[in-house]
């Protein structure tokens, strides 16, 4: 995961100081890309420990089309707590847009189901896209989508995925996003009887919050460890039937966790 450390270093060296919605302040760069070969290990950051339970359960929660944090809390995941209302609701965030994007005529579109079907029937399509950026519902969301759009690509019976992340909290958020979309790529590949190829992460406003700079510098002193591998223990009937127990990250070694405050 030296690729990720290079992004940290790039922001520390080249970033410009900017104000932000949270009032914390950031060092920011615009436009950055990282590529991860999924055949050479699963891209979990090793220079600090990641909470893989949160990564898996959050993705399963998205896939359910859920927008209430009750499922997350039942499974010991707190990463969305700060944005939920008193009832645990977040408004029409990721899961809603992925699974039931509303249309003008009162119907909904299950973007993910459609994309999986397209990959199976027309793998050369250039329209294998899922978007969470629904302009008509942004004002109803507790947090507008940071990872806004992703696209699949099939070549030589191998599946790749590229994510566009308009706003990237590089210290806290991006390691989760890399792992989450890499996991999704593995799951979709299994459902479509494909092998995996690459996950490509493309960031817009890539930033380190000013109260994360020391933590980023600590992380840069650590030597990356070998990447783990992912085992998916069964192939369920659909993309939406996976369970937490279906996934195992083999040989995940990491340096200790590094605590940092979240900007709300």
From Swiss-Prot:
NCBIfam families, A to Z: PRK01827.1-3 (NF002497), PRK01827.1-5 (NF002499), thym_sym (TIGR03284)
A GO CC annotation given for this chain: cytosol
Annotated EC: 2.1.1.45
Keyword terms: Cytoplasm, Methyltransferase, Nucleotide biosynthesis, Transferase
SUPFAM superfamilies cross-referenced by the UniProt entry: Thymidylate synthase/dCMP hydroxymethylase (SSF55831)
Similarity comment: Belongs to the thymidylate synthase family. Bacterial-type ThyA subfamily.
Catalytic activity: dUMP + (6R)-5,10-methylene-5,6,7,8-tetrahydrofolate = 7,8-dihydrofolate + dTMP
UniProt superkingdom: Bacteria
Entry function: Catalyzes the reductive methylation of 2'-deoxyuridine-5'-monophosphate (dUMP) to 2'-deoxythymidine-5'-monophosphate (dTMP) while utilizing 5,10-methylenetetrahydrofolate (mTHF) as the methyl donor and reductant in the reaction, yielding dihydrofolate (DHF) as a by-product. This enzymatic reaction provides an intracellular de novo source of dTMP, an essential precursor for DNA biosynthesis.
Molecular function per GO: thymidylate synthase activity
Subcellular compartments: Cytoplasm
InterPro entries: Thymidate_synth/dCMP_Mease, Thymidate_synth/dCMP_Mease_dom, Thymidate_synth/dCMP_Mease_sf, Thymidylate_synthase, Thymidylate_synthase_AS
Known pathway: Pyrimidine metabolism; dTTP biosynthesis
Quaternary data: Homodimer.
Underlying gene: thyA
Protein name per the record: Thymidylate synthase
GO biological process terms held by the UniProt record: dTMP biosynthetic process; dTTP biosynthetic process; methylation
Pfam families: Thymidylat_synt
Active site: 146
Annotated dUMP binding sites: 21, 126-127, 166-169, 177, 207-209
Record: residues binding (6R)-5,10-methylene-5,6,7,8-tetrahydrofolate: 51, 169, 263
Disulfide partners: none
